[in-house]
Amino acid sequence: MDVASILYFYHQKRLLLRNIIILELLKYYRRYFHNEEYFLPENRMYGRVGITTLFTFFWDITIDTINFAKKLCKDQKDVMVGGVMATILKERVYEITGIEPFEGTLSSAGILDDNDIIIDTLPLDYSILEEIDYVYPAHDGYLAYMTRGCVNHCPFCAVPKLEPEYKNYLPIAEQVDWASKQFGGKKDLLLLDNNVLASCQFDKIVEEIKKAGFTNDSVFVEPNMFEVAVKNIKVGYNEKAYIKTVVRQYQILISKYGFKLQGVYDLLEKKYLLKDYTAKKDAILETYDVVKPYFEEMYSKKRPRKRFVDFNQGIDARLITDTNMKKLFEIPIRPVRIAFDHWELHEIYEKAVRTAVEAGHTSLSNYVLYNYEDEPVELYRRLKLNVDLCEELNISIYSFPMKYHPIEDPDYFSNRDYIGENWNRKFIRTIQAVLNSTKGKVGKGYSFFCKAFGSDEDEFMKLLYMPEAMIIYRFYFEGIGLTDKWWNCFQNLTDAQLAIAKPIIESNDFSDYENLTDDLEILNVLSYYRIRREDAERAMGKDE
């Protein structure tokens, strides 16, 4: 046998041996995961698992997550559960999972460990946003509280239970500074205070915001996220997350410069650095000096952008004064969010808006509660008042209608099925259909508002009863005259006929109305409600 044959023989033998090893590894891990052997006590990796719960209507998946974590943690007692849902439904969570949740905020020392650290005052770990592919809407903002709790105890609100003690002032400048150095600076500041104007230290709060770098003339230049990521990789801070960041930065760089960086692309490909699941720390650091100048050039061209502050949960209209609005104007707040929960407050709300505008604020917003104890027409009145104020004062107000859910009611806490005493399924569905077309918000523009919600209260009530397909594809059905035909038939019903037809329409269930009435005129009206969105889309496609 010649030398070449001998070498070929040993090469094939090595390949076979390697393939056998790989095959055995694949068999092992297939069995390991198929049989869920990672749940066995000897294979559990985690000494402590923390779970933050959110909305109560995520009940099922949250409970599943807690029970899953119990199987991963070395000791079940070291599974920690807290957050909104766990606080509101503490007893139910314990009953189902056997884990007793932490209630409220971790605002005292020694709750989790025997030390003097107060968890609630620690900076957030923004690196977790680098772990996911989903781009969090508020990813470019610091998140913080400058107060906790609320002095009001509104019956529809969970804040008194979540944050029972009102705290007038929490500093944030050091948090912002540390987070900026660790994770890279962020453009905006999102404050989650529930009632900041109730604070007796409001002026101090505004000054602290300025100290944190948010003044009216402050600008933001995007940090070199490649350098931020490499710095954290070097010290071993959340390496998995920042390897993903580095790979994303490579992709941005190559996308921007294209064929000009063919050599860099070839190098990254050779080092398996173009995919986060193949990229390794050593390869990133090895190629760092080669790619560093290109990132410096790319980031040197970033333009300054204006920074903004947002008290995201809104401020109390009843506490707005000339003085605090002028003080608020010292920081780049946009928008000023003023709660408008009830029509009964419309005079106070309108005065608050005018006061804010007189102080210089022209970008406003609010949350508009509905499906609570309000009449449907009261939602219309509040939205229209905002549009009227926009027209009169030449300002911008964006309204966000928020549907009420009784989060502690045993029949409704885990779903979104609750219908207020003055509402019904059809009315709720109409509002949702309109808001879907406006992306959940109602802005300025009188003609648009009139088309979306009606020019007066009568038109709004007509809209509430309108077939859903005719709401979603308003122009199409109006154009072919079908909307007018439906409305004429509806109006021609007698009071006695409406007494039969309206409850059927309000149920928003048109599957078997033939069994509920044999009145031909009512049946004719109800037939319009069986027009589906798919029918309209097909018809519009044919017309094109």
Language model feature labels by segment:
Residues 136-178, 183-185, 197:
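Canonical Radical SAM [4Fe-4S] cluster-binding loop centered on the CxxxCxxC motif
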Residues 62, 172, 202, 321, ...:
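Aromatic/hydrophobic pocket-lining residues that form the small-molecule binding cavity
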Residues 2-140:
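Glycine-rich beta-alpha loop elements in corrinoid/cobalamin-binding modules
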Residues 178-365, 370-372:
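Conserved SAM/AdoMet-binding glycine-rich loop
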Residues 66-75, 158, 210, 357, ...:
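Surface-exposed amphipathic alpha-helices with a cationic face
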Residues 7-8, 15-20, 24-35, 42, ...:
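Radical SAM enzyme core and accessory elements
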Residues 64-69, 90-98, 204-210, 385, ...:
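Short, aromatic/basic amphipathic alpha-helical patches
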Residues 314, 327-492:
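A structural motif corresponding to the C-terminal lobe/cap of the Radical SAM core domain
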